[in-house]
Swiss-Prot record:
Protein name per the record: Glycogen synthase
Example GO molecular function: alpha-1,4-glucan glucosyltransferase (ADP-glucose donor) activity
Taxonomic superkingdom: Bacteria
Catalytic activity annotation: [(1->4)-alpha-D-glucosyl](n) + ADP-alpha-D-glucose = [(1->4)-alpha-D-glucosyl](n+1) + ADP + H(+)
Binding locations of ADP-alpha-D-glucose: 23
Functional description taken from the UniProt entry: Synthesizes alpha-1,4-glucan chains using ADP-glucose.
Family designation: Belongs to the glycosyltransferase 1 family. Bacterial/plant glycogen synthase subfamily.
Pfam family, one: Glyco_transf_5
GO biological process: glycogen biosynthetic process
Pathway: Glycan biosynthesis; glycogen biosynthesis
CDD domains: GT5_Glycogen_synthase_DULL1-like (cd03791)
Keywords carried by this UniProt record: Glycogen biosynthesis, Glycosyltransferase, Transferase
Amino acid sequence: MASQNPNKKKVLFVTSEIADLVKTGGLGDVSAALPRAMAHLHDVRVLIPGYPQVMNSENPIHIIGELGGHAALPPCKIGRMDMPDGLVIYVLICPELYARDGGPYGANNGRDWPDNHIRFARLGLAAADIAANLAQIHWCPDLVHAHDWPAGLAPAYMHWRGQRTPTLFTIHNLAYQGVTSLGSCPELGIPAHALQQEGMEFYGKMSFLKAGMAYSSHITTVSATYAQEITTPDFGCGLDGFLAAKTQQGLLSGIPNGIDESWDAATDPHLFAPFAIGDWEGKAINAAHVRELFGLKDSEGPLFAVVSRLVYQKGLDLTEAVSEYIVQNGGQIAIIGRGEPEEEQAMRELALRFPGQIGVRIGFNETDARRMFAGSDFLLMPSRYEPCGLSQMYAQRFGSLPVARNTGGLADTIENGVTGFLFNESTADSYREALSRAFKVFAFPELLNAMRCRAMAAPFNWCKAVEPYAELYEKLVAKALGKTHHK
């Protein structure tokens, strides 16, 4: 994937997940797709911890470097994994931190690992070490692009050391802040001057997310609307003033995510039947199979899908509140996802209330998700906030019209009344009004199919995101070198 083109910048992606190997949400999708989409412009390589899912993958790992310890952060090795398509992944090998059953952030019981501050400080320090050429891996980045709180200390360590390599920090979800006690400072080798309001201090504790924002050269988030929302108290999660100041300084911008080309109903091998724009027979076949999969009765009414993490942010309580309205009007709901135990139980109870009309599968696999997008008529996304969201783009690509709250990336990627249905207030009444519009459209097949056609044709590929990222990379590198950037 890398090229000898001297104009290409070398960029190190620092992330806690990548969809090829380990994924809990949209961060994993972006970490897999954006470096590949960027390949023709820059040499982007990915740094990720050596979780079991990474170490046990079918792709061989070759040890190429070693890094010493720092404070309580243990020494580690750097492995190189070459993906079949050429993407280079650097693996941070440290069994005492990462060789554990469970997910990237916690055990199978859902509890976070108590030493996450050590685990992800080690990731941030490794990125800083690679940027300083301490790993001696014969590749040194021109820019480090860190993602979300687990990578937040990468720009911080680089700043504290006086490293000149520019850094970009992307916020995928401001609510996850990587907060730990001030007493962790000595373990992490954090200088005392960092624990100030303009540094990583956060209401008497310290935040990895704030560190990434405070010490990076520039901050992005994953939609233009969300970039505006997080400067307000309603969405700022206690950081609105800090982010408003960054905006005023021209240091915060929104760049929307894209989706990869595999989301194509005409060619997707996971579907029960392929279909293209204007050909709805295949969609009907998928709908029948989805109903069977979820134990729903045969029906001529609309099929609504929920493909989501089952957490408070996603507004599942609102879907619960409008479920009777949907069923009474002839609709059915298929729900798939995993998340907080109380949300999972609420969805199970919802299915018991409406047997044959609402079906739930706790867990997640992408094959079922793709089939649900292909078979459903509408996707339900009543999120209280949504930094970008990918499901609404996947759904539109497969002809499923989103019924979604007018927030964040949903506002930027759904055209109300054209490719979906938006509602403003996080209330059941506002949600119900949008659903009534969806039911009315469903009653007129020509109108429904026209909206499906427009949704399936919406331009959600990564090309739209790559260009502003590439320009920002070039601008930050040029600034670090003391050059003037020209567009």
